Amino acid sequence: MIDELDLVVLKRDLPEERLTAGDVGTVVLVHQQGAGYEVEFTTLSGDTVAVVTLDATDVRSVAPREIVHARAVS
């Protein structure tokens, strides 16, 4: 189960938000017992790139053996 403040991985591109599949965000609000989430995506320096409402199928939990990959945001 994904809870508030958990890190999640985006499963699809959201070009209108400048986000790509694999970007990592923080859940700031859980909707309808996990049917959807409000997720904040930030730069590594903490600047907010986007806060988006996503369906549960759009994100997944981070795995214990994953590593974050940095990319520039245009």
Q: Each predicted region: which residue ranges?
A:
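Basic/aromatic-rich interaction segments and small domains that mediate binding to polyanionic partners
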Residues: 2-65, 70
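Predominantly soluble domains enriched in secretory-pathway, periplasmic, or organellar proteins
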Residues: 74
